[in-house]
Amino acid sequence: MPFTLGQRWISDTESELGLGTVVAIDVRMITLLFPATGENRLYARNDSPITRVMFNPSDTITHHEGWQLKVEEVTQENGLITYIGTRLDTEETGVAMREVLLDSKLTFSKPQDRLFAGQIDRMDRFALRFRARKYQSEQFRLPWSGLRGIRASLIPHQLHIAYEVGQRHAPRVLLADEVGLGKTIEAGMIIHQQLLAGRAERVLIVVPESLQHQWLVEMLRRFNLRFSLFDDSRYSEALLDSSNPFDTEQMVICSLDFVRRNKQRLEQLADASWDLLVVDEAHHLAWSEEAPSREYQVIEQLAEHIPGVLLLTATPEQLGQQSHFARLRLLDPDRFHDYEEFVNEQQKYRPIADAVTLLLGGERLTDDKLNLLGELIDEQDIEPLLKAANSQSEDSEAARQELVTMLMDRHGTSRVLFRNTRNGVKGFPHRVLHQIKLPLPTQYQTAIKVSGIMGAKKTLDARAKDMLYPEQIYQEFEGENATWWNFDPRVEWLLNYLVANRGEKVLVICAQAATALQLEQVLREREAIRAAVFHEGLSLIERDRAAAYFASEEDGAQVLLCSEIGSEGRNFQFACQLVMFDLPFNPDLLEQRIGRLDRIGQNREIQIMVPYLEDTAQAILVRWYHEGLDAFEHTCPTGRTIYDSSYQELISYLATPSEQEGLDEFIHTCRQQHEGLKLQLEQGRDRLLEMHSNGGEHGQELAQSIAEQDNDINLVSFALNLFDIVGINQEDRSDNLIVLTPSDHMLVPDFPGLPPDGCTVTFDREQALSREDAQFVSWEHPIIRNGLDLILSGDTGSCAVSLLKNKALPVGTLLAELVYVVEAQAPKHLQLTRFLPPTPVRMLMDRNGTNLAAQVEFESFNRQLNAVNRHTSSKLVNAVQQEVHTMLQQAEALVEAQAQALIETAKREADDKLSTELARLEALKAVNPNIRDDEIEALEHNRKMVLENLNQAGWRLDAIRLVVVTHQ
């Protein structure tokens, strides 16, 4: 093409320079000025890597002064182009714009514009873009979005609760599973779903101070959710940036004490427009009608301002009716306003629970029972269902299940309360206690005597705690460097035990970090035992490394030495040997220690080793836990109640272990109390609520469906392809592990989700669970989600040129592979992607206007193609530009029919699903007052907005690839 001064060209290799202008021409060279950057470039006149910029009718172009022109006519004179059209700001027609006046910062966003401007991508990027579109569309349609990306075992009851609650608008529920059943994971899954679906954007978690780090770790490790921990110092820092410090972060964890202490903070929190509030240990919020506690009032004030509320609490039976009512009152004060009324109402639900037990028992129903069921369900046309349930036919079981579902819907608090018990959930291991009584060394005897004399002024509480840890008493008198481990028989026993069990992973827990560190040194120096240490002084990354070292089968540590606080929130169910080097002060901490191994998914019996020193507080506490509470070999739901009521008597025995008069009787009384409370709990079990909470077959199906998705080979190949193209370094390790690190040539300088020092990932859920340092990669992992966004929100792969070597076709045959996207723009919370995700429609057009896509599958076609360098691609495009325009016009006519069909299907599906959901809730409102008006209103509004937005759905060209046939 002849060059003329003033022509506009773009660089094929440096498109970031913008639009260039020809400013000098000589015999062999031309000079382009790029006004956007002020740079000049010298190019050879022949075969230079630049492309002439020419726009077509219907394009919109920008003048260097900023106004835009809709092109209607293109004229050319002396090698220079003039565009004629309508000015968009003034609507003036017949306006002429010479090409020299085009805006130099011009960027090409439409695929065809980029193609004609020579901004042509590599072929593999086009393929990645199409796959990204295809897989993203498929993932949006799956019903369990937000559930499968978690780094946790697929446990049916947890998945069921999370699915049920996570799908709701502003859920307000009580999660009251027994200890060890995973309330934190359920809450995390609900948060994850709400965030992914756009139902929530700002989340506040309020927990006791001791659990802050546990929640921080759980949210990050299991759900890849980065919360900010707000304490006094963080609050002061944020105050410098904003009048309301809580507006500076989207997801915040803080302690209840942090909020309670300062009225201004509470008001700022309440004003910070949160979408979801999560409160752990909610059973500690004391309430009475006359005098609610300050803590209760704090949460009440927050719950009034925040639409969604999750309360995590002990089981209702443990709390008592009044305390249980107080939690429900936080969720819905209009519904639960009168305690007496609540008690009467609860009694009315007893027959419903009995009816469910009857139906599930499979026994024949008497006429009285049939009448009772008819009255309870109170539906027209219920007779055939009752008849089928009482028959011997094949339909009997299905009819009974349907009746149970109807009863569940009418159950008083089943929509706001979820509670599973260990009796209702199978899969827990047995626990076996081994008590190892050891002699009390004379050094400790002396230290304890002296401590008794010198510590006489200490409180009973402080003396009791001292007596449990004699090594600390000894160090108080002998100095911090006193070598207590040289004579403490527990150390000798531990060494021998570990040597005898070299093949076993052993978790050792002690109260203090210092004890753990000293034990590690002894194990290493005396028996060369490999041990990892885990305590509160370590950073999150250091704890991950220690846990990974312990988890590794090949060259890992045999022992993990944990302090009390350091072990919070970590689970090691691949080990089954637990050594308690000392004992914690209360039953909750004891259960927490055992809970590190006693989880669903533990496949072996848990061996609990308790070496203790005779004639000490340790010996008394072992007896009280085992004989009084049965807390070692079984979970102890009564522990906190009995601990609180017998606290004074217990600490007086612990503070003076030599005075044991009445101890046997005290332990016997505690055991009787324990058995009595346990019986009450068992009798008070609400089997209907348990059925509703564990989800039955629905939970099983969810777990199975997600497990099948876990082995998705498409994810692995797509992810590796994505890492290659983004420029992320990959290093294979053993055991299905890959180490990802940033490179110097990535598509973006900082890839979101990839730490600067890299991370270890695996596509295997079990592997991720056994390796603390390995992240579990699924379609929901931030690296994959951010990778999809990076590719699809930008121009990567939006145009390409390839060669097809095929002697069956004439040389020069031209094909245009077009990828259109059918989509609707709408606020994220409407979740339009359930019905119409951005859906790719692929077309393969020939010169005759025929679409060959149905006959030529993408992957097999892609494998036959060869890449072309950018410069050659530009020349090819210029040669066939007019033909491509014709093909695009032909494709537009064809894609409209396909797009409209997709949109109509989405509208029908949305209307059916949302109308059914709405009708069900409205019908249930008549028989179950726990269905909130605002929930129905939100669903009604949601349905209206979804259908409106689907009506406005459209389609656009997302990517184009020209394919030219060659025989070489």
UniProtKB/Swiss-Prot annotation:
Coiled-coil positions are none
PANTHER family membership: DNA ANNEALING HELICASE AND ENDONUCLEASE ZRANB3 FAMILY MEMBER (PTHR45766), SWI_SNF-RELATED MATRIX-ASSOCIATED ACTIN-DEPENDENT REGULATOR OF CHROMATIN SUBFAMILY A-LIKE PROTEIN 1 (PTHR45766:SF6)
Binding of ATP occurs at: D177, E178, V179, G180, L181, G182, K183, T184
DNA-binding recorded as keyword = yes
**SUPFAM superfamilies in alphabetical order:** P-loop containing nucleoside triphosphate hydrolases
Q: Name a biological process GO annotation.
A: regulation of DNA-templated transcription
State the species of origin: Yersinia pseudotuberculosis serotype O:1b (strain IP 31758)
Q: Can the keyword Cell membrane be found in this entry's annotation?
A: no
InterPro entries per the record? Helicase_ATP-bd, Helicase_C-like, Helicase_RapA, P-loop_NTPase, RapA_C, SNF2-like_sf, SNF2/RAD54-like_C, SNF2_N
Known function: Transcription regulator that activates transcription by stimulating RNA polymerase (RNAP) recycling in case of stress conditions such as supercoiled DNA or high salt concentrations. Probably acts by releasing the RNAP, when it is trapped or immobilized on tightly supercoiled DNA. Does not activate transcription on linear DNA. Probably not involved in DNA repair.
Look at the named UniProt entry and state the broad enzyme category this protein falls under. Answer: hydrolase
GO MF annotations in UniProt: ATP binding; DNA binding; helicase activity; hydrolase activity, acting on acid anhydrides
| Family assignment from sequence similarity | Belongs to the SNF2/RAD54 helicase family. RapA subfamily.
TM stretches of this protein: none
Write down the Pfam families for this protein, in alphabetical order: Helicase_C, RapA_C, SNF2-rel_dom, Tudor_1_RapA, Tudor_RapA
Q: According to the UniProt entry, what is the EC number of this protein?
A: 3.6.4.-
Supply the name of the protein: RNA polymerase-associated protein RapA
Q: Outline the extent of the Helicase C-terminal domain.
A: 490-644
Domain named Helicase ATP-binding: which ranges? 164-334
